[in-house]
């Protein structure tokens, strides 16, 4: 019923369950194939409680630039209630992101990510989207994508003062280190009507 639904939350193909007995029941159902092909692989992870944000990096194969961070709002209902969506709106800059946390993200996540791509000889130029969660002022990665996030792209690119074609040309030519990015310091927000 509703009580059970409140205790577990399905995020796309994930379940977040806060009671051991319910977790055992769901795991048993998965292992018995209740969810078809999706049940063939089950991953159990630590639950991280914090606030999410999105980090966007443009990487040219050698150099990288960090774009403005954004915070999206996934829940469909008012006051952050209801089921998760791809995003019902976003804001940039992120109100709770200070210089110290940004530096931790760059040192612990962005630099090792870029170095890993280089060390693995992965031929990649483009966007790196890093979904993060801030847990007591410590950043944790919850997902990577090689694209911009939606709806965050709308607020992030609105803040970029540079000509976007010039930025992408520098990315293609591996000259991101030769361009200074300029960002509007105003707050941008968007709302998805669904």
Predicted regions and their residues:
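Generic preference for hydrophobic
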Residues: 9-10, 44, 66, 191
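ATP-dependent carboxylate/phosphate-activation module, predominantly the ATP-grasp catalytic core
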Residues: 57, 63-109, 145-160
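Solvent-exposed alpha-helices and their adjacent loops that cap or buttress functional pockets
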Residues: 8, 33-39, 46-50, 57-61, ...
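Single conserved hydrophobic/aromatic residue that forms the stacking wall/gate
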Residues: 1-7, 11
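Conserved ATP-binding module of the ATP-grasp superfamily
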Residues: 16-54, 111-120
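Beta-strand scaffold of nucleotide-dependent catalytic cores
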Residues: 15, 25-30, 45, 52-81, ...
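Active-site "cap" helix and flanking loop/linker of ATP-utilizing ligase/carboxylase catalytic domains
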Residues: 106-128, 145-194
């Amino acid at each position: 019923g509703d009580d059970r639904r409140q205790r577990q939350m399905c995020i796309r193909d994930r379940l977040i369950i806060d009671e051991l007995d319910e977790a055992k029941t769901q795991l048993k159902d998965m292992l018995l194939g209740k969810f078809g092909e999706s049940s063939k692989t089950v991953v159990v992870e630590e639950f991280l409680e914090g606030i999410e944000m999105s980090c966007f990096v443009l990487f040219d194969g050698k150099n990288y630039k960090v774009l403005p961070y954004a915070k999206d709002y996934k829940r469909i209902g008012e006051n952050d209630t209801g089921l998760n969506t791809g995003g019902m709106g976003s804001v940039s800059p992120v109100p709770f992101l200070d210089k110290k946390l940004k530096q931790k993200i760059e040192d612990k996540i962005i630099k090792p990510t870029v170095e890993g791509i280089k060390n693995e000889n992965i031929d990649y130029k483009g966007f790196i989207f890093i979904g993060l969660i801030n847990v007591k002022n410590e950043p944790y990665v919850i997902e990577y994508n090689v694209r911009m996030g939606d709806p965050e792209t709308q607020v992030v690119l609105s803040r970029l003062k540079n000509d976007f074609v010039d930025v992408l040309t520098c990315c293609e030519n591996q000259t991101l280190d030769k361009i200074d990015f300029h960002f509007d310091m105003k707050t941008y927000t968007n709302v998805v009507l669904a």
